[in-house]
Amino acid sequence: MSALRRKFGDDYQVVTTSSSGSGLQPQGPGQDPQQQLVPKKKRQRFVDKNGRCNVQHGNLGSETSRYLSDLFTTLVDLKWRWNLFIFILTYTVAWLFMASMWWVIAYTRGDLNKAHVGNYTPCVANVYNFPSAFLFFIETEATIGYGYRYITDKCPEGIILFLFQSILGSIVDAFLIGCMFIKMSQPKKRAETLMFSEHAVISMRDGKLTLMFRVGNLRNSHMVSAQIRCKLLKSRQTPEGEFLPLDQLELDVGFSTGADQLFLVSPLTICHVIDAKSPFYDLSQRSMQTEQFEIVVILEGIVETTGMTCQARTSYTEDEVLWGHRFFPVISLEEGFFKVDYSQFHATFEVPTPPYSVKEQEEMLLMSSPLIAPAITNSKERHNSVECLDGLDDITTKLPSKLQKITGREDFPKKLLRMSSTTSEKAYSLGDLPMKLQRISSVPGNSEEKLVSKTTKMLSDPMSQSVADLPPKLQKMAGGAARMEGNLPAKLRKMNSDRFT
């Protein structure tokens, strides 16, 4: 046991599967030691609750030079303490360097020794040492302009250095101040006022098992073109043996219906319907205790005040998905406005929810349905079956009456009577019946008794049927056939009568 704990960590516990229980239970001293041991190790988050991704890039080697090619983005991505350090260090070095250049010019011209001579014109007036040169640079760079130190026209090198100082100072100011401004106005801070519920829930909604979580906007300013996406991160192994530690699957949160486009004025509940296309098709309350997955939620939109794109992220592990729960309502109608109570934003309550997966529910629904004969959905198969029945009728009508009774044609009405009387057989469709019965049953006003009586007459001895029992059209055809028979010669009429006798 100690070896297992060293391997899997302190989160390891011995669990057993029980056929009558609801899931996995810790193994007690009185239980069977032969039962299966399933180590349960806590999953390492890929995305924290605050949206930070737990990814560290290592062993880059020579690829680190790519960061210098995009120096501005590199500085913006640094933490604030490093930004402030670089900001102060850059200005300090630039000031000391330029002050040293002014001191070097004064030293090479001999202004430091001749500054107090009455008729001598120095390069920079009143610069006697390095501190005075540093103060002159600060007055020039910051455009303070006290007027006590100034450049004279007897120093061309000072004029060139002054131009270089102005250009370099403008570049440094634009780079560092721009970097600080971009970092302060980053839309990451806008994401701090976008809330996600602490837990996701699974319960029934509109008769379907649904995964739900809640999002909210704390500010009065809106998120323009807000869109939400969900990713399922789960490790799996391909049939070829390749192991994928972070396989990403898309969760449908309303792409086809447009429900992923949010009007985020008040808290909204995001829904993912679990169906045959969902990765959670096999997920049940019991299997959640052994599954390991992470649901990453990404909310994107444009900040109304700045026009910059903002993205907020969070994630839910299998331990943060509550089965059989529902969110408390947070919106109430007040006098002339709607009030949102954020104290109930994360609150949930239990609701009756089947503990089975959608796949298991569909299988149980099929098992509980009455046994029905397989319907012939193919038109070709239905046509062939009708032809077989017609051929069987032709064969039996040619037999003598005694053989017709032996073939069991009298038993057909009883079977049809049982089919029409039992309630469990009401699932039969008209496509499962012969074409003759379909035409009879499709006539309005034909009840089950009439259908059985007509079926009995149709399946009885055809020689006993009279013309009066036939429909009007068939009666006309039969009458026309009789008239045609009367017009035949005597020899043909005799042959026709001999054929039927």
From Swiss-Prot:
Q: Which InterPro entries match?
A: Ig_E-set, IRK_C, K_chnl_inward-rec_Kir, K_chnl_inward-rec_Kir3.1, K_chnl_inward-rec_Kir_cyto, Kir_TM
Family note: Belongs to the inward rectifier-type potassium channel (TC 1.A.2.1) family. KCNJ3 subfamily.
Q: What does this protein do?
A: Inward rectifier potassium channels are characterized by a greater tendency to allow potassium to flow into the cell rather than out of it. Their voltage dependence is regulated by the concentration of extracellular potassium; as external potassium is raised, the voltage range of the channel opening shifts to more positive voltages. The inward rectification is mainly due to the blockage of outward current by internal magnesium. This potassium channel is controlled by G proteins. This receptor plays a crucial role in regulating the heartbeat.
Regulation of catalytic or functional activity: Heteromultimer composed of KCNJ3/GIRK1 and KCNJ5/GIRK4 is activated by phosphatidylinositol 4,5 biphosphate (PtdIns(4,5)P2).
Q: Report the source organism.
A: Homo sapiens (Human)
Q: Which GO terms describe its biological process?
A: membrane repolarization during atrial cardiac muscle cell action potential; potassium ion import across plasma membrane; potassium ion transmembrane transport; potassium ion transport; regulation of heart rate by cardiac conduction; regulation of monoatomic ion transmembrane transport; response to electrical stimulus; ventricular cardiac muscle cell membrane repolarization
| Catalyzed reaction equations | K(+)(in) = K(+)(out)
> What is the membrane topology noted in the UniProt record heading this document?
Multi-pass membrane protein
Quaternary data: Associates with KCNJ5/GIRK4 or KCNJ6/GIRK2 to form a G-protein activated heteromultimer pore-forming unit. The resulting inward current is much larger. Associates with KCNJ9/GIRK3 to form a G-protein activated heteromultimer pore-forming unit.
Q: What is this protein called?
A: G protein-activated inward rectifier potassium channel 1
GO terms for CC?
Answer: external side of plasma membrane; I(KACh) inward rectifier potassium channel complex; parallel fiber to Purkinje cell synapse; plasma membrane; presynaptic membrane; T-tubule; voltage-gated potassium channel complex
Bias-annotated ranges (Low complexity) = 18-38
Please indicate the residue ranges that the annotation assigns to the motif Selectivity filter: 143-148
Intramembrane stretches listed in the entry: 130-141, 142-148
Q: Where is this region: Disordered?
A: 1-40
